[in-house]
Curated annotation (Swiss-Prot):
Main location: plastid
GO cellular component: chloroplast; mitochondrial large ribosomal subunit
Region Disordered, residue ranges: 1-28, 227-251
InterPro entries, per the entry: NA-bd_OB-fold (IPR012340), Rib_uL2_dom2 (IPR014722), Ribosomal_uL2 (IPR002171), Ribosomal_uL2_bac/org-type (IPR005880), Ribosomal_uL2_C (IPR022669), Ribosomal_uL2_CS (IPR022671), Ribosomal_uL2_dom3 (IPR014726), Ribosomal_uL2_RNA-bd_dom (IPR022666)
NCBIfam families: rplB_bact
The protein, known as: Large ribosomal subunit protein uL2c
Biased composition (Polar residues): 10-22
Family annotation (Pfam families): Ribosomal_L2 (PF00181), Ribosomal_L2_C (PF03947)
Quaternary structure and partners: Part of the 50S ribosomal subunit.
């Protein structure tokens, strides 16, 4: 992936950059792997806002991505690398020998025409999925299962990868991008390599309208609201929040307060917390 930097010929292109999409080999998605995606605008089934700052955005169709990699010991050919509006990573279209087609996350350096497979005996090549117990120490992996057979749940964002650092008993120890070190069951599957499109983090939107295209609405500071709208609101002119520490719109501690639930079932898996 390359980054296209725009000249400042309008205010909207000043400091603007975007992907050059040089790695995209096919523009039209596979129709059999599309699903309807309804815009929720942050509302739940009762119409109550449960996620703020969501709404609008370009109409999208969901691409059904295979996170489980449960088609074992059957080789597939990479037919194309495609854009997915629902995530920052690219997706790869696979054509299996038995005729089935599936999408997977496109790892770095995966090219059209490459052969990929999943299973305990799959070779240690980029894009192949194996149990963590069969992957050597020091290998970079992504799309990692937390429970065997549930499908990949972590390390799916563009440019991310985890490293296998130890194996002991029924667990494999991973170092995550957040510097957290945690254990995962050795039967869990993971995909070899790093997720592609690593330059995504260096993009600059350049104008508010591009945020709106993504379905993200403005975030208003609580200190500029009225007292009835936020605990930080009110006062004459530019006044402070009037509290010892910042809080959320509902009065809960914010900015630095740990939000992980105490005594969570997976606490025993975490060796070192993220920084």
């Amino acid at each position: 992936m390359g980054i296209r930097i725009y000249r400042s010929y309008t205010p909207g292109t000043r400091n603007r950059s975007s992907s050059d999409f040089s790695e995209i080999t096919k523009s039209k998605p596979e129709k059999s792997l599309l699903a309807k995606k309804t815009q929720k605008a942050g509302r739940n089934h009762r119409g109550v806002i449960t996620v703020r700052h969501r709404g609008g955005g370009h109409k999208q169709r969901y691409r059904i991505v295979d996170f489980k990699r449960n088609k074992r010991d059957i080789e597939a050919k990479v037919a194309s690398i495609q854009y997915d509006p629902n995530r920052n990573a690219r997706i790869a279209l696979l054509h299996y020998k038995d005729g089935e087609k599936r999408y997977i996350l496109a790892p770095k350096n995966l090219s059209v025409g490459a052969q990929v497979s999943a299973g305990e005996t799959a070779p240690l090549d980029v894009g192949n999925a194996l149990p963590l117990s069969n992957i050597p120490l020091g290998t970079s992996v992504h799309n990692i299962e937390l429970l065997p057979g549930k499908g990949g749940q972590i390390i799916r964002a563009a440019g991310t990868s985890a490293q296998i650092v130890a194996k002991e008993g029924n667990f494999v120890t991973l170092k995550l991008p957040s510097s957290e070190v945690r254990m995962v069951y050795k039967q869990c599957y993971a995909t070899i390599g790093e997720v592609g499109n690593a330059e995504f983090k260096n993009l600059t939107l350049g104008k508010a309208g591009r945020k709106r295209w993504l379905g993200i609405r403005p975030t208003v500071r609580g200190v500029v609201m009225n007292p009835c709208d936020h605990p930080h609101g009110g006062g004459e002119g530019r006044s402070p929040i009037g509290r010892a520490r910042p809080v959320t719109p509902w009065g809960a501690p914010a900015l630095g307060m740990k939000t992980r639930r105490k005594n969570k079932y997976s606490d025993f898996c975490i060796i070192r917390r993220r920084k």
